[in-house]
Amino acid sequence: MEKRVAVIGAGISGLLACKNIMEKGFNPIVFEARSGIGGVWSRTIESTKLQTPKSFYQFSDFAWPPSVTETFPDDKQVMEYIKAYAIHFNILPRIRFNCKVTCIDYVLHGNEDFPSWDLWGGTGWPFSPTGRWNVTVQDARDPTAPVEVYQLDFVILCIGKYSDLPNIPDFPLNRGPEVFNGKVLHSMDYAAMANDCAADLVANKRVTIIGFQKSAVDIAAAVANRNGVDHPCTLIFRTVHWIVPDYFLALTLKSLNRFTEFMVHKPGQGFFIWLLAVLLSPLLWIFIKLGEAYLKRKQPLKKYNMVPEHGFLKQLSSCIFTVLPANFYDRVEEGSLVLKKSQSFNFCKNGLVIDSEETPIATDIVIFATGYKSDEKLKNIFKSSYFQKCITESLAPFYRECIHPQIPQLAILGFADSPAILYTTEMRSKWLAHFLAGKFKLPTIREMEDDVKKWEKCMKYYANERYKRSCISALLPIYCNDQICKDMGFNPRRKKWLLAELFAPYCPDDYKYLCWQM
């Protein structure tokens, strides 16, 4: 009997999941709440472009068209590339648009008690003879329409981390947005606006941005470029991060080869690998300090008190990658962009009051670029309180960054952070497709839990208080891919000669023929 597999979401992760499992003979259903594909790439601000060089942000078996000559394509070029991929691999007929999944519920027939299982799903294989997922789907265009419930053998969640559930700080009574006479919105809402509408919204307005990661600095730079010194944009943040030129991040990615990974401790490492990391770690420290010194020399960080308190390695370990917008510090120098570091702030009638100043910041519009509640979004899709607790009560990463040891017949793609997220997700989707095809069996639940705890301990060593369970492969992308290749029974060494294997970077091209191997 044919196994029914559902993919929830038609962003990049959902398209990759659908394509790879189709190649294994499955006929998946893809539920997409919106009317188009692309996920976050379908809703971006006008100045958005790739932060990752396109050689690291491409499908392994579908190259960028020759017409895209830029190293960092813009959002329109990325969307065209994603659409071309979906058309080329005939994914679009599998997608049911405007179908919002409101909840998923695991139903186990018989007298089994799955929390007591030793093996994932009771067998260690992807499908169970007794377990099914009930997926409740609502028409996104008509909330009053009757819901539909689909019974499925396996579910792949590709709902994305950076959408739908914005993270907005709480404020004391009468000190929040309710007392403010201006407009308050989240960067998600700003990015969803048409470019001309977004431009009209901020034109000749005093705009304040809250945050200091990618969306925050991109929006702040765009507003400052548009409004100039007559209506300066204010950027308020608690923590200074390293924001780097695009070529610097590209160089960092290209330096992540097997040799540099020898400098990093690995989970479950033996004595020789541990000793090698100890002996080579001073070299890693030198590389990092040289990079920090270069950034301090090329950017006026000391002048504007923008030198981060943490090192670049800790930031890289926590998957914070922010590229410096063009002319960012030029806008600061001329006064069209004002930087304000503050641990707290409150709203008042005409603007914001920060803890270090008595005079309010006069503001017409406040944009929160403060991220998303990704764990809560993931938790909310489950009907079972047990599965909800599995998501929220542990900081351990997922096994192979896509399998929760306690949640059977389900995978999560696109939740892992990475400097090259498409590349990372594609490798996991290939792994998942092989698993669904019955090519290998998962370890016991205890073994998977022990494995992810080792990863957690290892990454906390580098990221410390900035550790996130969604970020475990930033320093060890090749090592992670080696594990995936070994699980699938493939040779992890993809280069043709030894020096390239040691010192050349690994890119999606290196895994181009992986899915063709049996």
Regions of interest found by a model, annotated:
Residues 45-67, 254-263:
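N-terminal glycine-rich dinucleotide-binding loop that anchors FAD/FMN and/or NAD(P) in oxidoreductases
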Residues 452-460, 471-472:
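Long alpha-helical segments found as membrane-embedded helices
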Residues 242-272:
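A catalytic-pocket lid/entrance helix-loop region that shapes and gates access to the active site
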Residues 2-47, 70-242, 246-247, 251, ...:
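Flavin (primarily FAD) cofactor-binding/catalytic cores of flavoenzymes
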Residues 254, 447-455:
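Post-kinase regulatory C-tail/linker adjacent to protein kinase catalytic domains
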